[in-house]
A protein has these predicted regions:
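Sequence-level detector for tyrosine residue identity
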Residues: 6, 10, 26, 89-92, ...
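Generic low-complexity, intrinsically disordered sequence content enriched
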Residues: 1-2, 33, 49-50, 142, ...
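Amphipathic alpha-helical segments enriched in hydrophobic/aromatic residues interleaved with Lys/Arg
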Residues: 104-159
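N-terminal regulatory/effector-sensing and dimerization cores
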Residues: 18-111
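A short, N-terminal "cap"/entry segment at the start of jelly-roll beta-barrel domains
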Residues: 1-19, 137-143
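N-proximal short alpha-helices
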Residues: 11-21, 44-45, 121, 128
Length: 163
């Protein structure tokens, strides 16, 4: 098999109408890197793989995010990030989560309550395994949109069924 790509090397995905950019993003920041406060134009979930990241937002004021932790930032949130150590994380950007199971969604909406304080969630073993398998593929120049769609659905499935 030529190369280490998940897709066939002879397919050019750049012109594909289903090319999905920046839905899943892998970030690798060196210690001290600062991302100034910026307004989220979409909802996002940040999945920490390695290191410590200081997040400052209305929902998470001064929270240090560590390996295996997740936070959700809503559309309109203003978020500032500082890498306290070398960090690796994956961000999932979305307007609406894909609806995988309508019954489960309705059950969650009936039971959901706004938290008094926002704290990071801890990734389950399955979710951590999924997230840590993504960086190599996401680092490719043009990751396959069908693969990204599948991984997004898998993320949502694991989150809605285990949290």
């Amino acid at each position: 098999m030529p190369g280490d790509s998940f897709c066939i090397q002879y397919t050019n995905c750049t012109g594909c109408p289903k090319n999905v950019e920046n839905i899943l993003v892998y970030r690798n920041l060196p210690k001290g890197e600062h991302i100034p406060k910026d307004k989220c134009t979409q909802n996002c979930m940040l999945f920490m793989i390695k290191g410590e990241l200081l997040i400052n937002s209305e929902e998470h004021p001064g929270i240090t995010l560590r390996e295996r932790q997740i936070v959700l930032q809503a559309i309109g949130s203003k978020v500032e990030i500082l890498a306290l150590t070398d960090v690796e994380y994956v961000v999932y950007w979305f307007n609406e989560l894909p609806l995988l199971c309508e019954e489960r969604y309705k059950e969650m909406m009936e039971q959901a309550e706004a938290p008094l304080t926002y704290t990071p969630l801890i990734m389950s073993e399955r979710l951590y395994h999924l997230v840590t398998s993504m960086p190599e593929f996401l680092a490719e120049e043009n990751p396959c949109s069908k693969y990204i769609d599948l991984k997004c659905k898998e993320l949502v499935f694991l989150i809605t069924n285990f949290y």
